[in-house]
């Protein structure tokens, strides 16, 4: 009889624990944004910026962008986390890199085939952002040397209908526009092969 009672107690405990665990997971998924400071080291909070790749082709030649995509995670992004008027790595972790098998025209810039680093210079609403193509490669994203700039070109801004949680870099209009989207902003620049 004691064995049956212990088994019943164990089964009841497991059922209760799984019910509470499911409720706990649901509560974590639907919890509102915290109102105070958030620690990166809180259990069950993954603030990673996964490595992403975006590519297009011109005349069967590939152009690939490698970047790390940060998440908003209830933070104010532009003007705070990403300050206006300061060069931004345009992602997270290592520098955002463009590798092209063909010479490109990016906005007003003539970019030779090869590997380059992309930065942006965010501006307050109403002023154009600048896309920066830099010749230095392989560095961490916060390392920037202006003397290595190939050049800067203005971008076109538009507002997204809903906030985008994770930053993305995509090719649109059959690969002829490069878009950087995050939060409620969509910054774009035309790209063509030379």
What are these regions (language model features)?
Residues 2-12:
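Bacterial N-terminal signal peptides that target proteins for export
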Residues 26-86, 123, 136-194:
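Primarily secretory-pathway and cell-envelope proteins
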Residues 11-21:
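Bacterial N-terminal signal peptides
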